Design a protein with these regions (language model features):
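Thiol-based oxidoreductase modules, predominantly thioredoxin-like and allied folds used
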Residues: 372-385, 396-405
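Eukaryotic scaffold repeat domains enriched in small/polar residues
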Residues: 16-317, 412
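Thiol/disulfide oxidoreductase modules built on the thioredoxin-like
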Residues: 390-397, 402-449
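N-terminal "domain-start" segment that seeds a small globular fold
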Residues: 306-334
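Short pre-active-site segment immediately N-terminal to redox-active cysteine/selenocysteine motifs
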Residues: 340-342, 346-350, 415
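Hydrophobic beta-strand anchors of alpha/beta hydrolase catalytic cores
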Residues: 343-344, 375, 419
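Sec-dependent N-terminal signal peptides of Gram-negative exported proteins
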Residues: 1-16
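Conserved redox-active cysteine motifs that mediate thiol-disulfide chemistry
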Residues: 346-363
Length: 455
């Protein structure tokens, strides 16, 4: 998986341990670079690198884990309508799930990539700070944020854009952190400018606060082209915003352009006055408040390490699909692969990354014995002729199963290629979204080799 906050944000944050012994009565505000969601006595956090949501109790013990193919790379989560969770995907999709993990709805978002928040009965979207895409020109009269209905459709635009020198930089310049309170006001912190502003529910700016994070500010600019790529220079300032259980605004920001020196500021939501500042060290952190409203900082990896492993979830639903090279009318069931580590790969002839992936899959297939490892490559082509032409071109050594264009609706993946690595008992070892090149396949090889050796 590939992702970035702004140009550079997926780097280490701070790690310091709170004083005062065992944690008690905490609400998480931020976990690593993402805002957390407080709902029904639990703090929910997104874990983009493991494609899941995790819930902590007030003692910061993990009490629930949610996974779904539609939770591909979750980077943000907020409470939604008092009982559900609204998840921001790295690509900008919005996914509404209940606390049992059922996906209730999803939408693509109003911007090239969106970040969502909810409060005061409203859903709002800003341009995402996690996936900044230049070269998508926008009108300077476009709104800063979009008000959405319950289906994720824009109903109104609020706030004014900061207009940079090039229309191609409107998106990166106006991407940023977003939060909303129960009264319907919203707070916006531009990714690359040292300011945080509060707006009322009509989009009127109420106050703006600067935190002194930058001595000199510049808008994002293009660097000299590198081949077909046009790099973007962007200094990360605002990372994430959250409304605490005490009604105060908490701002996670960066004191250096690469977001390696982070700090948390506590602001009076009514006036924007900074009440407290806490600087964070090196490493991944979890920032929380206790029942008295005091800030506490924990090592995020240590909190995750205390989780009891529930075991691997099964791959469902089980399939029984025709083998392109088999006898007409026969099907190959998932159970056929039992007893072997298996890579279930979904692909299609129209998928360009799939074309890059197939030679690497063929090489991977040849590196293991058939009693230990197998690949089930499932085509999701509707056009059987194009599927057969693809197979004739690449001549894969592994089985090709025919999905007939029904696989996305069955397994709910967002794009292709999509792969699921299964252990010998059919439990999910890993989900792989997209194509990560040779480096990803080397990691996959190492994971398979380790699993093959496991008792």
């Amino acid at each position: 998986m590939r992702r970035a906050l702004g140009a550079t944000l997926w780097l280490a944050v701070s790690a310091c341990r709170p004083t005062g012994g065992t944690p008690s009565g905490f609400t998480l505000l931020f976990f690593d670079h993402s805002p957390a969601a407080a709902l029904a006595g639990r703090s929910w956090v997104p874990l983009p690198d493991s494609s899941r949501l995790v819930a902590f109790d007030p003692q910061l013990r993990i009490v629930r884990t949610l996974t779904d193919p539609r939770l591909n790379t979750p980077v943000g989560v907020v409470p939604y309508r008092g009982r559900d969770l609204l998840v921001t995907e790295f690509t900008g999709a919005g996914v509404v799930v209940d606390t049992a993990g059922r996906v209730l709805r999803e939408w693509p978002g109003p911007f090239t990539a969106s970040l969502y928040t909810a409060g005061g009965g409203h859903v709002l979207a800003s341009r995402s700070p996690y996936f900044v895409q230049p070269l998508a020109p926008e009108s300077p009269t476009a709104p800063l944020v979009q008000l959405l209905d319950s289906a994720g459709r824009p109903t109104d635009g609020l706030g004014q854009l900061h207009v940079p020198s090039s229309p191609f930089l409107l998106g990166p310049t106006n991407a940023g952190a977003l939060a909303a309170d129960s009264g319907g006001a919203f707070y916006f912190g531009p990714l690359a400018r040292d300011e945080i502003s509060k707006y009322d529910r009509t989009g009127r700016r109420l106050w703006t606060t600067k935190r002194g994070l930058r001595a000199h500010e510049t808008d994002p600019v293009f660097l000299p082209a590198r081949g077909v790529r046009l790099p973007l220079a962007l200094a990360v300032v605002n990372v994430a915003l959250a409304i605490g259980p005490d009604g105060r605004l908490y701002a996670l920001g960066s004191e250096d352009s690469a977001a390696t020196r982070l700090r948390v500021d506590v602001l009076d939501a009514a006036t924007g006055r900074i009440l407290e500042t806490r600087r964070l060290g090196a490493g991944r952190t979890a920032v929380a408040v206790d029942a008295r409203g005091a800030l506490a900082v924990f090592d995020a990896d240590s909190l995750l390490a205390t989780a009891h492993s529930p075991g691997r979830e099964p791959f469902t639903p089980a399939f029984a699909l025709p083998d392109l090279g088999g006898v007409v009318g026969d099907t190959v069931p998932l159970g056929h692969f039992a007893g072997r580590v298996t890579l279930v790969n979904f692909w299609a002839s129209w998928c360009d990354p799939c074309r890059e992936e197939f030679p690497l899959m063929a090489a991977l297939y040849g590196e293991f014995d058939r009693k230990d490892f197998e690949i089930a490559a499932i085509s999701d082509d509707v056009d059987a002729g194009k599927m057969r032409a693809f197979v004739a071109q690449f001549r894969p050594p592994f089985p090709i199963l025919v999905g007939g264009g029904r696989m996305k609706a069955t397994y709910h993946y967002r794009g292709l290629p999509y792969s699921v690595l299964l252990d010998r008992r059919g439990g999910i070892i890993a989900r792989i979204f997209g194509f990560g090149g040779a480096a990803e396949f080397q990691r996959l090889h190492d994971t398979i080799a380790k699993e093959v050796r496991a008792p």
